[in-house]
């Protein structure tokens, strides 16, 4: 049976951008329903278990430059949810190829999901006054408007009706939801044509993340990461030893393919992709990979790294009712860029709704 649930605001996507947007809205006294189709929060700040092995297979670390995100990280650090990993990585896999620049690289205490989980726990805790609800496993099928409100139908026949909405998935997915709801510049006069043009130019590289559980320590140099220079020309962009990183009790590698390889082999059978990447990773695996690799798993990130960056922290699709897109394609492709985008989007929506209330 169809049912409609009224909400003050709705945020689609419970990655770092969506969580930070919710944080701002709750601080402004707004109630929030935060939706994500995955089983948990965090988005690409993702940690996986393979038996007793623990590995980050999405974002590998983050840096802090700005005060706003720095405050969030400081709170999480005090709670033990994040720790400093190092100040740089080898650029070529050698002990002498260290690329330190003095900036701290942070990681989750037990994996990269620890930071988003810490933010989520605070949002649904007593301090928020019950103003935030997080629904995982919730698939949004469209975003539209009716009667001056945003309508967000879910695949379970529930429709959320909100005063305002923030979309934080990868931009192509957000555009698909808006298009499914009929919110195109041609179909809706109040839509922002310039906003659509800006969003439609955003593109992403895919990325294969290969996880390899090893029977012995790897050859990855301390502190457990190799961030290859693009000029190196190989198909591997990154290798991490999650045991050296401090999150896994046993040796397990995370290998990220570069954008060119991932595009070229995106539809290649997974076993073939794993064979190719393992062959290129041989120098950092002790022994014959045929016996040294005791378990393996491949994850395919379709929208891994934005190749087009929108300098503004958000793009407003509609002002009446307010709808905005935010996330990792805004203000920089790093974790901090996504967080800063979410914070800005949350503040924007709170201001718009406060202005509407004042005028009413």
Question: Language model features by range: what are they?
Answer:
Residues 244-248, 298-325, 329-331:
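FAD-binding beta-loop-beta segment adjacent to the flavin cofactor pocket
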């Amino acid at each position: 049976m169809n049912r409609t649930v009224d909400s003050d605001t709705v945020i689609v996507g419970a990655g770092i951008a969506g969580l930070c947007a919710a944080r701002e809205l709750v601080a402004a006294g707004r109630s929030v329903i935060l939706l994500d189709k995955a089983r948990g929060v965090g988005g690409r700040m993702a940690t996986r278990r393979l038996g007793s092995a623990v590995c980050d297979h999405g974002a590998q670390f983050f840096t802090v430059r700005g005060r706003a995100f720095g405050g969030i990280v400081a709170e999480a650090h005090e709670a033990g949810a994040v720790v400093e990993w190092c100040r740089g990585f080898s650029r070529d896999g050698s002990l002498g190829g260290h690329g330190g620049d003095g900036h701290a690289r942070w990681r989750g205490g037990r994996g990269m999901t620890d930071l988003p989980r810490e933010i989520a726990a605070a949002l649904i805790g007593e301090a928020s006054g019950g103003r935030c609800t997080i629904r995982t496993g919730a698939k949004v099928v469209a975003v539209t408007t009716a009667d001056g409100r945003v309508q967000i139908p879910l695949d379970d026949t529930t429709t959320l009706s909100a005063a305002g909405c923030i979309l934080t998935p990868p931009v192509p997915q957000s555009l698909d939801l808006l298009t499914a709801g009929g919110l195109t510049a041609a179909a809706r006069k109040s839509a922002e044509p310039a906003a659509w043009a800006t969003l439609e130019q955003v593109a992403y590289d895919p990325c294969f993340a290969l996880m390899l559980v090893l029977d012995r320590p790897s050859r990855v140099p301390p502190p457990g990461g190799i961030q290859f220079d693009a000029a190196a020309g190989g198909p591997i962009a990154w290798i991490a030893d999650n045991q050296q990183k401090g999150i896994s009790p046993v040796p397990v590698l995370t290998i990220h393919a570069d954008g060119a390889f991932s595009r070229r082999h995106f539809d290649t059978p997974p076993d073939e992709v794993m064979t190719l990447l393992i062959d290129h990773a041989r120098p950092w695996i002790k022994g014959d990979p045929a016996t040294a690799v005791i378990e393996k798993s491949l994850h395919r990130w379709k929208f891994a790294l934005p190749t087009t960056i929108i300098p503004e922290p958000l793009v407003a699709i509609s002002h009446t009712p307010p709808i905005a897109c935010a996330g990792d394609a805004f203000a920089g492709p790093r974790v901090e860029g996504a967080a800063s985008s979410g914070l800005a989007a949350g503040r924007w929506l709170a201001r718009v709704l406060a202005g509407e209330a004042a005028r009413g």
